[in-house]
Amino acid sequence: MDRLLDAAARLFADVGYEGATTNAIAEEAGVSIGSLYRYFPDRKALLGALAERHLRKMRGLHDRVFTPDVVYLPLPVLLDRLVDPFVELHTECPAFAHLLLGADTSADIADATCELDAEIVDRLAALFRQLAPGLDAARARLVASVSKSNVKALMSSVASQPDPAGRAALVAETKKMLLAYLQSVVDGGR
């Protein structure tokens, strides 16, 4: 089944959801079309399974990066810790940005993505309140939302940037922007 999902992810990234037929996915996976239909009744089911797999990976990454020690890290190191694993994940599978942000996203996938976004905002807001104890809850949520939105935009850009040097430049510039923003929040506490 993973072979089918991996093949679907490659084709969705290369030719888009509409261009990736079930026959092409089966061929890319090196299996018969009957084998594909044994696990997935249609392309939409493949898309849903891919999105679920990605959301599980994202939640797992959140759990690994949001450990109690992150509050003690210098901001540049903190940003590396929070951003780099997600860049790596989206670089490994550029179809993820298409799955979660694209027009092909189903209502269920969109709901799950919104839920994941809310979780990350909650975690970031709590972290920012620890970093800047004078920060009120509403401002912490706003800072968290702005930060999450910038990183989410970065993930979309990373997924569409085939050049490793170009990706690295996008990541570096986004981190510089976030560092300046977050440093002003931490220094000002509001």
Task: Spell out what each predicted region is.
Residues F66, V77, L89-D108, A125, ...:
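Amphipathic alpha-helical segments used for helix-helix packing
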Residues L47-H54, L116:
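Alpha-helical DNA-contacting segments of helix-turn-helix folds
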Residues A49, D63-T91:
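Hydrophobic alpha-helical connector segments
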Residues A97-G102, A110, Q130-M177, G189-R190:
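Hydrophobic/aromatic-rich alpha-helical bundle segments in the mid-to-C-terminal region
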Residues P41-A45, V70, T91, D104:
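Residues in soluble alpha-helical coiled-coils and helical-bundle/repeat scaffolds
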Residues L4, A8-F12, M58, F86, ...:
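Short hydrophobic clusters on alpha-helical segments that form packing/core surfaces
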Residues R3, A7, L11-A45, A49:
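Helix-turn-helix
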Residues T67, V71-Y72, E92-A97, A118-A144, ...:
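Hydrophobic alpha-helical bundle segments that form small-molecule/ligand-binding pockets
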